Amino acid sequence: MAKQTSLLKFRGKLGDLIGYKVGKTFYVRSAPELVHQTYRTQIASGYFGKASRLGAVMRRAMKGMLHVPSEPGAVNSLNKALLHVLRQDDMNRRKQFIPRNFGELQGFSFTPHASLDRVLEVKPTIVRDYHGRLHVTVPAIGAHACNPRATHVCIRAVAVHVHPGRTTATASASEPVLLSAGEPSEAFTLVVPGVRDVVSCVILEVTSVQEEHGRYYQLQNRKYSAAEVIAVLGPKSAQAMQVHSPYASRMRQRLPLVEGLIIHPMQRE
């Protein structure tokens, strides 16, 4: 493929040319005059297209929700993971996205440079209540594996809700919790606004933050930023639970649950 050198760049088909974007570079190649596809190739391309469309829907829903540095290969990685989910369907001749198969997304990482278990030593638990809210409980943390320059560790939970029909998706996030980087922390619970009767992919995000003159800056080192799918909850996974307000208010006083916290653009290191 040749690089596009014109002022106006494009993606997709334009006449007898096809434009591509790989990373931040645009390429172009000529379109073939005739395409030969076997029956199996046509089916495989249809499955890939179905996975790509759902991947695009989920990425649009998540736009601006994750604070970790963006990865150029995240698009293809998510499409590949969704294609694996689609192929798990063994009930339909034309494979469909089945809610129970979305569990295959658990463990999918948006940050190939750092897995979640590298920056977080504990395993969180997730429960969906009757109203659809997601309660992500993070156990007590003894030591934080964060950036050496960090003064705080920021932990958030983001949920992508895939609606029936698999053509629409929404996303919601909890308020961030700031933990002192040099001190152990007590257990806390993140509450994500939820939607009933949807498939919810719960993502836990851990980033390193530096405080300067009362302002918080996210550090850019990718080795200490992680975002990973920790659970996938189906439409029937709601559980009856009771949240005691005295405990919740006591935890709010002890842990810095910062509503409307502004994390300024990442610092270069």
Which stretches of residues belong to each language-model region?
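Long, polar/Ser/Thr-enriched low-complexity segments
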Residues: 1-114, 261-269
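Compositionally biased low-complexity segments at domain edges in trafficked proteins
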Residues: 235-269
